[in-house]
């Protein structure tokens, strides 16, 4: 690597960056022929940091700065490299060498360039870059994933009106990236404050993706070898818990949110009407999203069984439901129950539905006693009480298979079982029959 470094020092910044990609491509391609998972050594990472991210190797040396045009040209070089490299394994290891966080001073430059590269790949639909980014999101700590998600949201949902359509179109190009992007976005926007409510354009795009193909949010889960114990501090296998958080907290978060007013240019009435219209659109979108999430949950039992993970792997961890319930309880306390009764009722209804379907499908592994303890401090909700109580079961019916309890034979909660029919009573005594005498006339006189 030292010989390569000396030759690169004589080049300008752009040609050196292009040359280092070329050398590492040859190096890792040869390694892949002998080992399925080549090791990215320290020398390779240092070359990339010095000649791609412009971080000097010598201590005290001033870092080089690329101007905007040079940075754009560097992004084009990288996009072209990943597009032209036909072997996915080589692309993946080069991408990992470039952008895996190292915990050093180069990480800021690394994340900045990654955000710009993925944003460019979205704009020009470079599928190999998006696929590499999807793998990166899957194996990188969540703190870095949300940084990339924030860059894409700012570029396509905040800066230029209407640019969200460009991001929306990658749904068919790279569904795997879309799945990981949704998971990152739900980790970023947790509705804990008004600043962390997802922008309307982002919400509308995600709902349209999931409503068109609900299986989108299961792509990572369905296509990844899964261990029973998932690593902590990384993105979830699916965005299910994040989407449930959105649907459940949305009624309370939007009730808490106050409409923003312009600096005197728009009247209070106009701003209020605009905010009300936006809230109505948001409520419809969250209702649509909630339906899609329930539909996905209902399919999970089959998928978990096929992977031999039913009852062994909870895609929705009980430990993640605990802070969600605490946040709902806190929001309900902050809002005046007299003014937010409908919103509290809606949030608890959605929570109850999600809990019931998730437990039934095997996505949430817990007992009814766990739920009673968890939800004991929440405001009263009829549907939630039914879910917590669970089905009432009596001894099996003799004419039915064991374990089957028809609801018509289930007694009410407050009463004991009563037999449907009393014991058979003795037969009534029979009376002797009367003989018919044909010669006797029947006296009849009409009433006048």
Curated annotation (Swiss-Prot):
Keywords: Chromosome, Nucleus. The gene is Ints15. Its main location: nucleus. Disulfide bonds: none annotated. This is Integrator complex subunit 15. InterPro entries: INTS15. Belongs to the Integrator subunit 15 family. Transmembrane segments: none annotated. It holds the Pfam family INTS15. One of its GO terms (biological process) is mRNA splicing, via spliceosome. Component of the Integrator complex, composed of core subunits INTS1, INTS2, INTS3, INTS4, INTS5, INTS6, INTS7, INTS8, INTS9/RC74, INTS10, INTS11/CPSF3L, INTS12, INTS13, INTS14 and INTS15. The core complex associates with protein phosphatase 2A subunits PPP2CA and PPP2R1A, to form the Integrator-PP2A (INTAC) complex. INTS15 is part of the tail subcomplex, composed of INTS10, INTS13, INTS14 and INTS15. Component of the integrator complex, a multiprotein complex that terminates RNA polymerase II (Pol II) transcription in the promoter-proximal region of genes. It comes from the Eukaryota. The keyword Secreted does not apply. GO terms for cellular component: chromosome; INTAC complex; integrator complex; nucleus. It is found in: Nucleus; Chromosome. The lineage of its organism: Eukaryota, Metazoa, Chordata, Craniata, Vertebrata.
């Amino acid at each position: 690597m030292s010989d390569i470094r000396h030759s690169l020092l004589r080049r300008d910044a752009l040609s050196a960056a292009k040359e280092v990609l070329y050398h590492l491509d040859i190096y890792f391609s040869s390694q892949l022929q002998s080992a399925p998972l080549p090791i990215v050594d320290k020398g390779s990472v240092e070359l990339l940091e010095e000649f791609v991210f412009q971080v000097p190797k010598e201590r005290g040396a001033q870092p080089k700065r690329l101007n905007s045009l040079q940075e754009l040209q560097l992004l084009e070089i990288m996009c072209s490299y990943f597009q032209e490299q036909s072997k996915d394994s080589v692309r993946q290891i080069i991408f990992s060498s470039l952008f895996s966080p190292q915990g050093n001073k180069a990480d800021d430059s690394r994340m900045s360039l990654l955000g710009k590269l993925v944003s460019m790949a979205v704009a020009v639909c470079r599928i190999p870059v998006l696929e590499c980014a999807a793998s990166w999101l899957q194996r990188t700590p969540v703190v870095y994933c949300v940084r990339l998600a924030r860059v894409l949201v700012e570029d396509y949902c905040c800066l230029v009106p209407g640019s969200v359509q460009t991001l929306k179109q990658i749904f068919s190009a790279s569904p795997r990236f879309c799945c990981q992007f949704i998971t990152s976005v739900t980790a970023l926007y947790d509705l804990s404050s008004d600043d962390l409510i997802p922008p309307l354009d982002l919400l509308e795009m995600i709902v349209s993706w999931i409503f068109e193909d609900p299986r989108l949010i299961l792509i990572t889960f369905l296509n990844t070898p899964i261990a029973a114990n998932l690593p902590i501090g990384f993105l979830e296998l699916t965005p299910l818990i994040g989407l449930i958080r959105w649907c459940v907290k949305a009624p309370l978060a939007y009730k808490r949110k106050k409409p923003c007013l312009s600096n005197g240019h728009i009247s209070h009435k106009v701003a209020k009407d605009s905010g009300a219209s936006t809230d109505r659109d948001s409520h419809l979108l969250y209702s649509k999203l909630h339906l899609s999430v329930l539909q996905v949950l209902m399919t999970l039992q089959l998928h978990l069984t096929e992977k031999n993970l039913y009852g062994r792997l909870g895609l929705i961890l009980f430990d993640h439901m605990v802070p969600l319930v605490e946040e709902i309880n806190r929001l309900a306390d902050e809002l005046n129950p007299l003014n937010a009764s409908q919103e509290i009722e809606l949030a608890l209804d959605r929570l109850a539905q999600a809990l019931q379907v998730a437990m039934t499908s095997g996505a949430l592994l817990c007992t009814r006693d766990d739920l009673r303890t968890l939800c004991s401090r929440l405001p009263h909700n009829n549907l939630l009480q039914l879910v917590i109580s669970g089905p009432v079961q009596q001894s099996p019916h003799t004419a039915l298979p064991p374990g089957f309890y028809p609801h018509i034979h289930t007694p009410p909660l407050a009463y004991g079982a009563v037999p449907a029919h009393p014991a058979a009573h003795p037969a009534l005594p029979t009376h002797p029959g009367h003989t018919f005498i044909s010669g006797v006339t029947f006296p009849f006189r009409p009433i006048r």
